[in-house]
Amino acid sequence: MLWIWAVLPLVLAGSQLRVHTQGTNSISESLKLRRRVRETDKNCSEGLYQGGPFCCQPCQPGKKKVEDCKMNGGTPTCAPCTEGKEYMDKNHYADKCRRCTLCDEEHGLEVETNCTLTQNTKCKCKPDFYCDSPGCEHCVRCASCEHGTLEPCTATSNTNCRKQSPRNRLWLLTILVLLIPLVFIYRKYRKRKCWKRRQDDPESRTSSRETIPMNASNLSLSKYIPRIAEDMTIQEAKKFARENNIKEGKIDEIMHDSIQDTAEQKVQLLLCWYQSHGKSDAYQDLIKGLKKAECRRTLDKFQDMVQKDLGKSTPDTGNENEGQCLE
């Protein structure tokens, strides 16, 4: 009976040793497998890419990858890019093609070479426009010279105009010096005459503020949106949308829906803001939004349009006399 108790510890120790050995072997096999995977990643020859467990050939220009290859050195399943909308100009293994560049006619650009499956669109400045920076997205209208041209405008440089002679400048300065006091005297005379007329005619005392409503909070902006968009670049329209809390996903959706029509993209970006904002206080908030997006030129034109329309829409019998007093 005593020999059983003596042998039992030896049996248990042997069992634990076998379990430990099996666990060590399992870890060793896992490390070997990982090492083989890493070696497979590094074993792809130059020009091949790792597609699952295999080294695959890239897709050719004008195509995109649909599925990886099924054997080492094999060719993946590739599909052509969308003609006229997408391109790929080199060997690759991406599952998407690049989008073709659009030439914005509203900003002086026109197509030089159409987009193909293997080449992006090439844009150039329209006649009488130029751009002096690389990767140009906005061409500028060539200057017109009042005193003659030294060098004509080209696609990459503005017109070089002949400068005005010092003698002409002296004449101009003299005229300005004489005109300034005359204008001052004339304006003072008109104000005095206007004040007297208003005193004599009670009906004409109506303030000009009544002819142009002070509160434009409920002014409908629907008819102004296309005219505002026409004056903005697509970058300014996108910046306006971002600065006024339009989500990036919605901006991308609008850009994709009208991918070939820059003018429509700009209109839809502004309409998206207007629809989400509502009519109430839209006039004041649009002005704030344009300032925030640094669209000063567009803001000035918009205010001029509204001022002009409001002036026409409010007839008044005293307008003629009052208009002369606005100076």
UniProtKB/Swiss-Prot annotation:
GO terms for biological process: activation-induced cell death of T cells; apoptotic process; apoptotic signaling pathway; B cell mediated immunity; cellular response to lithium ion; circadian rhythm; extrinsic apoptotic signaling pathway; extrinsic apoptotic signaling pathway in absence of ligand. PROSITE patterns: DEATH_DOMAIN, TNFR_NGFR_1, TNFR_NGFR_2. The modification Phosphoserine is found at S217, S220. TNFR-Cys repeats lie at residues 43-79, 80-123, 124-162. Residues 222-306 form the Death domain. Residues 204-309 are annotated as: Interaction with HIPK3. Disulfide bonds join C44-C55, C56-C69, C59-C78, C81-C97, C100-C115, C103-C123, C125-C139, C142-C153, C145-C161. Palmitoylated. Palmitoylation by ZDHHC7 prevents the lysosomal degradation of FAS regulating its expression at the plasma membrane. The modification Phosphothreonine is found at T206, T314. Residues 222-246 are annotated as: Interaction with CALM. Keywords: Apoptosis, Calmodulin-binding, Cell membrane, Disease variant, Disulfide bond, Glycoprotein, Lipoprotein, Membrane, Palmitate, Phosphoprotein, Receptor, Repeat, Signal, Transmembrane, Transmembrane helix. Residues 22-169 are extracellular. Its main location: membrane. Residues 308-327 are annotated as: Disordered. Induction: Expression oscillates in a circadian manner in the liver with peak levels seen at CT12. GO terms for cellular component: CD95 death-inducing signaling complex; cell surface; external side of plasma membrane; extracellular region; membrane raft. Residues 314-327 have a biased composition (Polar residues). It is a single-pass type I membrane protein. A lipid is attached at C194 (S-palmitoyl cysteine). Contains a death domain involved in the binding of FADD, and maybe to other cytosolic adapter proteins. Component of the death-induced signaling complex (DISC) composed of cell surface receptor FAS/CD95, adapter protein FADD and the CASP8 protease; recruitment of CASP8 to the complex is required for processing of CASP8 into the p18 and p10 subunits. Interacts directly (via DED domain) with NOL3 (via CARD domain); inhibits death-inducing signaling complex (DISC) assembly by inhibiting the increase in FAS-FADD binding induced by FAS activation. Binds DAXX. Interacts with HIPK3. Part of a complex containing HIPK3 and FADD. Binds RIPK1 and FAIM2. Interacts with BABAM2 and FEM1B. This is Tumor necrosis factor receptor superfamily member 6. The gene is Fas.
